[in-house]
Curated annotation (Swiss-Prot):
Official protein name in the record: Chaperonin GroEL, chloroplastic
Binding site for ATP: 29-32, 86-90, 414, 480-482, 496
Gene: groEL
Assembly mode: Forms a cylinder of 14 subunits composed of two heptameric rings stacked back-to-back. Interacts with the co-chaperonin GroES.
Tagged with keyword Transport: no
Cell compartments where the protein resides: Plastid, Chloroplast
Species name: Guillardia theta (Cryptophyte)
Length: 529
């Protein structure tokens, strides 16, 4: 296929046009008075969303070159989503502002490589400042405030997530399920999460999220490698196919031929099956398999205990209400075995007391936390499917933001942290940088106010005056866009996780500096229709 090649200013302008389109579509959602975006679906009802990265993923332009610009800035959003789970709209707005400022300087003859160095140094300075100003999250109130802001100023949701973290602990698992009513509720269930995922991607049931979700499955637990198809696998698969329920196999490993048999059965719809490697090593693996067996009411098929796969019966299999498996993790939500789980926890506690090795104690403590902590399940309620999807996305953002806040602390939200740090950056850059590097740092300085500017513009106010007032105030002071007042952000609970603010800025700066140093674009020539 023949190619189109664009150089210098033409190349950068084409990328910029694509970025303008994406940034405008995403930034209308920013802030408490941000609007929604409707996404058309080939099948089913349209989706209404308020989530930056979801919108960014949907935008494909007809012009190949402009589409390259869209793809580049989309990367800033999705990378931020991967690292922090929230702050994708802010990352998009920042990247767009930096490119806009930088394009003018490159067109005026500034050295793009020196600009890039300046942008990188400025970003590093801001990241260290954010870490210095961040406050640790100490109480439930701060957690609920972070969650409320991320869920689109929904105070009830914030309280619910704070409750969930209270109950399962900061390391605990919070999972989302579609509820049966219009009310969103929190439910504590017995459950555990371990760090092993599916063996083959062919088992995936939800391709968009790359997850396997199985409701009401049987669970086969074994501490051996499954190698023989005829003797070991087929009897089990025949048993399960009669019940028409899903099957989760947790084994030391599944050899190629046996794995191929499972995949074929899954793809042909004969048995809905998934295989997962057992967690841990050696004796710890056996102990963890026994923990899972007690949680799910099953038995570990182990030759030590005189069981084999050839003589398997249904009552040896565990059962769960729901199992969610990703590439890295497996979350089991079980119910109805409270008594057994409690006595197992007591047994582990006694082992902890008796153990004199600190490593051993730590590993036992991990097992106890996994078994006793349970899983908080938030059942998302909504009147329509469209509302359900929107709510789930918001809740996901809120859970991710809360975990990020616990990790790296909190800073004033609503774009005010970056606005305040713009002054510090200007002073630091003028003292430490020269020529085009200084210009690069000042590009970042001017861009730092863009999230706040957009939040204010989405409320219909004039941003210039408000931004100046905030710049001259204390670090805690910011703009409450919902009420249209300048307030102490910590007092009113408008706070962001430091990790979200930091990673949004880092990814925006990375993409912007790549675009500013672009001298040539090569894209496929479009067919004339």
């Amino acid at each position: 296929m023949s190619k189109i090649i664009l150089y210098q200013e033409d190349a950068r302008r084409a990328l910029e046009r694509g970025m303008d389109i994406l940034a405008e579509a995403v930034s209308v959602t920013l802030g408490p008075k941000g609007r929604n975006v409707v996404l058309e679906r080939k099948y089913g009802a349209p989706q209404i969303v308020n989530d930056g990265v979801t919108i960014a993923k949907e935008i494909e332009l007809e012009d190949h070159i402009e589409n390259t610009g869209v793809a580049l800035i989309r990367q800033a959003a999705s990378k931020t989503n991967d690292v922090a789970g929230d702050g994708t709209t802010t990352a998009t707005v920042l990247a767009h502002a930096m490119v806009k400022q930088g394009m003018k300087n490159v067109a005026a003859g500034a050295n793009a490589i020196a600009l890039k160095r300046g942008i990188e140094k400025a970003t590093q300075f801001i990241v260290t400042q954010i870490a210095e100003y961040a406050r640790p999250v100490e109480d439930t109130r701060a957690i609920s405030q972070v969650a409320s802001i991320s869920a689109g100023n929904d105070i009830e949701t914030g309280k619910m997530i704070a409750d969930a973290i209270d109950k399962v602990g900061r390391e605990g698992v919070i999972s989302l399920e579609e509820g049966k009513s219009t009310i969103t509720e929190l439910e504590m269930t017995e459950g555990m999460c371990f760090e092993k995922g599916f063996i083959s991607p062919y088992f995936v049931t939800d391709t968009e999220r790359m997850e396997v979700i199985q409701d009401n499955p049987y669970i086969l637990l074994t501490d051996k490698k499954i190698t023989l198809v005829q003797q070991e696998l087929l009897p089990t698969l025949e048993l399960i196919s009669k019940t028409s329920r899903p099957l989760v196999i947790i084994a030391e490993d599944v050899e190629k031929e046996a794995l191929a048999t499972l995949v074929v059965n899954k793809l042909r719809g004969i048995v809905n099956v998934v295989a997962v490697r057992a967690p841990g090593f050696g004796d710890r693996r056996k102990a963890m398999l026994e923990d899972i067996a007690i949680l799910t009411g099953g038995q570990v098929i182990s030759e030590d205990a005189g069981f084999s796969l050839e003589t398997l019966t249904l009552d040896m299999l565990g059962q769960a209400r729901r199992i969610t498996i990703t590439k890295e993790n497996t979350t089991i939500i079980a119910e109805g075995n409270e008594k057994d789980v409690k006595s197992r926890c007591e047994q582990i506690r006694r082992q902890i007391e008796a153990s004199d090795s600190s490593y051993e104690r730590e590993k036992l403590q991990e097992r106890l936390a996994k078994l006793a902590g349970g899983v908080a399940v938030i059942k998302v309620g909504a009147a329509t499917e469209t509302e359900m999807k929107d709510k789930k996305l918001r809740l996901e953002d809120a859970i991710n933001a809360t975990k990020a806040a616990v990790e790296e602390g909190i800073v004033p939200g609503g774009g005010s942290t970056l606005t305040h740090l713009a002054n510090d950056l200007k002073d630091w850059a003028e003292d430490n940088l020269i020529e085009d590097e200084l210009i690069g740092a000042l590009i970042v300085e001017r861009s730092l106010t863009s999230p706040l500017r957009r939040i204010i513009e989405n409320t219909g106010q004039n941003s210039a005056i408000i931004i100046e007032q905030i710049k001259e105030s204390e670090f805690n002071i910011g703009y409450d866009a919902a009420k249209g007042e300048i307030v102490d952000m910590y007092d009113v609970g408008i706070i962001d996780p430091a990790k979200v603010t930091r990673s949004g800025l880092q990814n925006a700066a990375s993409i912007a500096s790549m675009i500013l140093t672009t001298e040539c674009i090569v894209v496929d020539k479009q067919d004339e229709k």
